[in-house]
């Protein structure tokens, strides 16, 4: 028995030492190949894999910028834009306008009698919208799972879900992201404008596309997978028929695990509303205990890896730019669960 205990202890030490060496070799602090991340940052952590961002990693990403060209990865949003059925509609309402100010005359300083003889006015709007529309970054509180409705790091919706937003792992905990980015163009690999409805992007697809592009995913990389869907967004995302035809293509559990556990992807995204293919296969659903969004559960809840959605990758695809510095910041609105209507950038 003593011999067995000593053997187990020795193996544990070797495993931890190997993980430590691997982390040092990759520049990662907590990522372990074959495991990924998970709940490894302590019981109060709300940041997840983005804890890996450092001054050195940001500087390394910026060294990829050689031409100064900026690719705007954001999609324009308005009241008619496409929304997943599980998110609210939106409205943009004019609150003040030059014509209204002249008509109302409710503010003395806006009138000629009040000294405004030059006719100065202003526009001001009220925006009512979901925190999950257009180009977005899912926060770690976005998805819960299990009968206890836990989200990342074991936080419970019953304890941290407030009347005025979430109180743990909200969007303000997402740090500004400056990291190496890689775009994997699966649509180009398949030689189609956009992937077909409910197409599952496999590990083999990702590997073949990376080989074709002569680029690789290294630990700490932000990965963006192109399906071709975003080209149908149009001016404001109102071409819903075209969008919905292709929006259900995406990665499955095997591809998600390969990206995170084998390649060390820091964040994973695409040009669709949900990253993963839907509906999932029974096997993928059961992989997380039964779910209609198994990749979301795996990445956000189990791994603490943020999901990037509806990124406009058409410019990168047209120029065949596959490696770049990815830069994104979220709206600092407390209680929200996703950075929404964003304009991330790829710098080359």
Label the predicted regions.
Residues 1-9:
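Bacterial N-terminal signal peptides that target proteins for export
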Residues 8-19:
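Bacterial N-terminal signal peptides
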Residues 24-348:
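Active-/binding-site microenvironments in catalytic and ligand-binding cores
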